[in-house]
């Protein structure tokens, strides 16, 4: 795909109100890609004006999420940049100035209604079937200014023309028409000087030179307000593109009641950031060549925003696990898997007896055996306990296999003991020779050994597993099971 003719400036603007959300990662991926494709800039702005919902460590965790995903912004509160500050709470003076500028130009007005008066006005408007009418809208400019100068509490509201319509042009949709009579006069600046989302969002996007506003489709209903603000200021509108929301399997909006929504949960489960990005890239978009597995560089090479579809992509955890397993088996080298797996286990304070690092021969042997059977790193210890401890459980199915083949175990133990070399090829050859000699099928010979040494019938290739465990450990377990 040829590079866009002009650099795109994109942004994400999360609010630090809780766990770093998978939806932020999703929107961040597409904004990051659009900027990188064009040699533009990707901005991370923190919208922290809602102090009631503010969570102190949330901002730090958002940065950590973006770093983990390798979606590094060019400008943010961490890096700084030419258009900072990048926290809205540090830009309050700007918003007040711009709100008053709109009052002076006649596109906004001071409003003095109390909360009780507003409640009554809303009830009246609801009964009449129209938007709330604000009496202060009809005050003369001098009269309103005099009340402000006298210290009377006031908000600043957008003055929406009651005639005509406002059209939102969205790159992913046909033009969306909103009747102006159905758009209420939104508060832009609160009485305490705090801006609302609408004012701060538009002012920041303009001052940070954002060219493309790519965000979730839940913001479509706010966009006519933003369009009206751009027009009131005399500023050109950015390109708007509202991405489809991530959905649960029942097509409801993704929520933590049905799917984990915190990216930290996926990190703690041992998902790979590359697999997460690959999966998120397929949410509403398909590779033009039908590829399912591709890296961030390939996504940047072929992605076109116009190709996003709006069908409501399903965030399928089983599919994400499938992607992660594919990366473990087909994309990363075994060295890389071992290194990352060892780091994951150390981070989670898992003790591996006698393992001194990711290159430890025994750890590497176990990793080699388990890669085909892993989807996420968190599964590793549950699936490999018998490699690390003699105190491993024997499940019901395995116990039945031991009981059914108990008379074979002493002879098999003796033959394993007498093998000249204890490697997978020799072990496999011994099993076949024993089965042929006794007139048994391999399905009778191998299960009791597997059950005895692993406590489960779900384990890797048996000869390779026995070689990794070593002769001494295998014989002790088989002899114990035979008693």
From Swiss-Prot:
Regions crossing the membrane: none
Q: Which Pfam families match?
A: Anticodon_2 (PF19269), tRNA-synt_1c (PF00749)
- What is the predominant subcellular site recorded for this chain? cytoplasm
Q: Which terms does the UniProt entry file under GO BP?
A: glutamyl-tRNA aminoacylation
Q: Where is this motif: 'HIGH' region?
A: 14-24
Where can this protein be found? Cytoplasm
What are the UniProt keywords, alphabetically? Aminoacyl-tRNA synthetase, ATP-binding, Cytoplasm, Ligase, Nucleotide-binding, Protein biosynthesis
Chain location of the short sequence motif 'KMSKS' region per the record: 253-257
GO CC annotations, alphabetized: cytosol
Q: Which GO terms describe its molecular function?
A: ATP binding; glutamate-tRNA ligase activity; tRNA binding; zinc ion binding
- Where ATP binds, per the record, is at 256
Q: What is its EC number?
A: 6.1.1.17
> Which reaction is this enzyme known to catalyze?
tRNA(Glu) + L-glutamate + ATP = L-glutamyl-tRNA(Glu) + AMP + diphosphate
- Write down the InterPro entries for this protein, in alphabetical order: aa-tRNA-synth_I_cd-bd (IPR045462), aa-tRNA-synth_I_codon-bd_sub2 (IPR020751), aa-tRNA-synth_I_CS (IPR001412), aa_tRNA-synth_I_cd-bd_sf (IPR008925), Glu-tRNA-ligase_bac/mito (IPR004527), Glu/Gln-tRNA-synth (IPR000924), Glu/Gln-tRNA-synth_Ib_cat-dom (IPR020058), GluQ/Sye (IPR049940)
Organism domain of life = Bacteria
Function field? Catalyzes the attachment of glutamate to tRNA(Glu) in a two-step reaction: glutamate is first activated by ATP to form Glu-AMP and then transferred to the acceptor end of tRNA(Glu).
Q: Which NCBIfam families does this entry report, sorted A to Z?
A: gltX_bact
Subunit info here reads: Monomer.
Task: State the family named in the UniProt similarity comment for this chain.
Answer: Belongs to the class-I aminoacyl-tRNA synthetase family. Glutamate--tRNA ligase type 1 subfamily.
Name of this protein: Glutamate--tRNA ligase
Q: Which organism is it from?
A: Deinococcus radiodurans (strain ATCC 13939 / DSM 20539 / JCM 16871 / CCUG 27074 / LMG 4051 / NBRC 15346 / NCIMB 9279 / VKM B-1422 / R1)
* Organismal lineage: Bacteria, Thermotogati, Deinococcota, Deinococci, Deinococcales
């Amino acid at each position: 795909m040829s590079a866009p003719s002009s650099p795109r400036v994109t942004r994400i603007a999360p609010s630090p109100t809780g766990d770093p959300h998978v939806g932020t990662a999703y929107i961040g991926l597409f904004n990051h890609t659009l900027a990188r494709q064009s040699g533009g800039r990707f901005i991370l702005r923190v919208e922290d004006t809602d102090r009631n919902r503010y969570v102190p460590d949330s901002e730090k965790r958002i940065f950590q999420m973006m770093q983990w995903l390798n979606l590094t912004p060019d400008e943010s509160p961490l890096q700084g940049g030419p258009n900072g500050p990048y926290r809205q709470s540090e830009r309050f003076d700007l918003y007040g100035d711009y709100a008053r500028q709109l009052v002076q130009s006649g596109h906004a007005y001071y409003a003095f209604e109390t909360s009780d008066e507003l409640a009554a006005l809303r009830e009246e408007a609801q009964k009449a079937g129209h938007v709330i009418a604000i009496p202060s809208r009809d005050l003369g400019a001098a009269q309103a200014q005099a009340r402000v100068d006298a210290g009377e509490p006031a908000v600043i509201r957008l003055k929406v023309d009651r005639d005509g319509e406002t059209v939102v042009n969205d790159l992913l949709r046909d033009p969306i028409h909103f009747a102006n009579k159905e758009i209420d006069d939104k508060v832009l600046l609160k009485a305490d000087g705090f801006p609302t989302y609408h004012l701060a969002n538009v002012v920041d996007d303009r001052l940070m030179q954002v060219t493309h506003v790519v965000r979730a489709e839940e913001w479509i209903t706010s966009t006519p307000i933003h369009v009206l603000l751009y027009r009131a200021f005399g500023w050109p509108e950015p390109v708007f593109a509202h991405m489809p929301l991530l959905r649960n399997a029942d097509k409801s909006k993704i929520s933590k009641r049905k799917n984990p929504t915190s990216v930290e949960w996926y990190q703690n489960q041992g998902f790979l950031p590359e697999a997460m990005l690959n999966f998120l890239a397929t949410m509403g978009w398909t590779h033009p060549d039908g590829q399912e597995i591709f890296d961030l560089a390939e996504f940047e090479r072929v992605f076109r925003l116009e190709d996003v579809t709006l069908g409501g992509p399903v965030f399928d955890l089983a599919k994400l696990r499938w992607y992660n397993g594919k990366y473990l088996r087909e994309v990363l080298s075994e060295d890389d898997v071992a290194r990352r797996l060892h780091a994951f286990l150390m981070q989670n304070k898992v003790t591996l007896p006698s393992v001194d690092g990711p290159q430890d021969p025994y750890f590497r042997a176990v990793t080699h055996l388990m890669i085909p059977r892993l989807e996420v790193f968190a599964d590793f210890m549950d699936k490999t306990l018998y490699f690390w401890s003699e105190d491993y459980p024997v499940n019901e199915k395995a116990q039945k296999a031991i009981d059914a083949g108990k008379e074979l175990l002493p002879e098999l133990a003796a033959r394993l003991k007498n093998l000249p070399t204890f490697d997978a090829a020799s072990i496999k050859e011994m099993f076949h020779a024993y089965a042929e000699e006794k007139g048994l099928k391999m399905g009778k010979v191998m299960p009791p050994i597997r059950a005895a040494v692993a406590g489960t019938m779900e384990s890797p290739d048996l000869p390779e597993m026995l070689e990794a465990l070593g002769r001494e450990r295998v014989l002790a377990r088989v002899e114990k099971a035979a008693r």
